Curated annotation (Swiss-Prot):
NCBIfam families registered for this protein in UniProt: 3a0107s01c2
EC number: 7.3.2.1
Uppermost EC category: translocase
Organism: Lactobacillus delbrueckii subsp. bulgaricus (strain ATCC 11842 / DSM 20081 / BCRC 10696 / JCM 1002 / NBRC 13953 / NCIMB 11778 / NCTC 12712 / WDCM 00102 / Lb 14)
Family: Belongs to the ABC transporter superfamily. Phosphate importer (TC 3.A.1.7) family.
Ranges for domain ABC transporter: 6-247
Biological process annotations from GO: phosphate ion transmembrane transport
Function comment: Part of the ABC transporter complex PstSACB involved in phosphate import. Responsible for energy coupling to the transport system.
Protein name: Phosphate import ATP-binding protein PstB
Topology within the bilayer: Peripheral membrane protein
Top-level taxon of origin: Bacteria
Residues noted as binding ATP in the record, renumbered to the chain: 38-45
Reactions accelerated catalytically: phosphate(out) + ATP + H2O = ADP + 2 phosphate(in) + H(+)
């Protein structure tokens, strides 16, 4: 039986007077890749950023309903948001390495969480870079600036940085949109490997990417979750006419 990692119930999100998400209900299961697709402005990134409360940083943002991580409402007032963001990591659209060495990029999060022992940090950096499938590329460049890496290397470094604090969920907001096809393929292969140990939620404009790597897909339109289900079924036999029109390119 599949285990729910994140449960979203009757979620409505507002930016001041703008109603951005309407009554979203969704079960995101452990050790799966869930893809959010839909045209620009449909709400998919807004929902993604709600899963670790990044939207808290947006003035006027408020929610009704609930998002539960392992059964605990993440919008509970007693919840430490820093701990939440350790458990639910994020990789952004454009690679955003810090202006410091490769090593210090990966060690940044563990240091914030109180790890100072060099041997322990060395192990975390090596393990995280190996998990991100970039250790062999960077093991001799650990003390060099991360800003000198290629775009694809920078994005895998950012994934390693997210993994260094041992998250349970990894959110990816269009992680390959700024990358070339070869780098994109490497990130997709990496995501498929990472789902063995992590739950992954990815926003993508690339529908074929959703087909290639995701187990479940949600199609969003104008703040509504139009359809959600097994990726193969959603793309081969969509239940909603709007989904069918979108995936066949008739709008979007």
């Amino acid at each position: 039986m599949m285990e729910d990692k994140i449960t979203i119930e009757k979620l409505n999100l507002y930016y001041s007077d703008f109603h951005a998400l309407h009554d979203i209900n969704m079960h995101i299961q452990k050790n799966e890749i869930t893809a959010f697709i839909g045209p620009s402005g449909c709400g998919k990134s807004t929902l993604l950023r709600s899963l670790n409360r990044m939207n808290d940083l947006v003035e006027g943002c408020r929610i009704d309903g609930s998002i539960k991580l392992d059964g605990t409402d993440i919008y509970n007032g007693d919840l430490d948001v820093t701990v939440l963001r350790q458990r639910v990591g994020m990789v952004f659209q454009r690679p955003n390495p810090f202006p410091m060495s490769v090593y210090d990029n990966v060690a940044y999060g563990p240091r914030i969480h109180g790890i100072t022992d060099k041997k322990e940090l060395d192990e975390i950096v090596e393990t995280s870079l190996k998990q991100a499938a970039i250790w062999d590329d960077l093991k001799d460049r650990l003390k060099k600036s991360a800003l000198g890496l290629s775009g694809g290397q920078q994005q895998r470094l950012c994934i390693a940085r997210a993994l260094a604090v041992k998250p349970e969920v990894l959110l990816m907001d269009e992680p390959t949109s700024a990358l070339d096809p070869i780098s994109t393929s490497k990130i997709e292969e990496l995501a498929l490997e990472l789902k063995k140990n992590y739950t992954i939620v990815i926003v993508t404009h690339n529908m074929q990417q959703a087909v290639r790597i995701s187990d479940k897909t949600g199609f969003f339109l104008l703040g509504d979750l139009v359809e959600f289900g097994e990726t193969d079924q959603l793309f081969s036999m969509p239940k909603d006419e709007r989904t069918e029109k979108y995936i066949t390119g008739r709008f979007g």
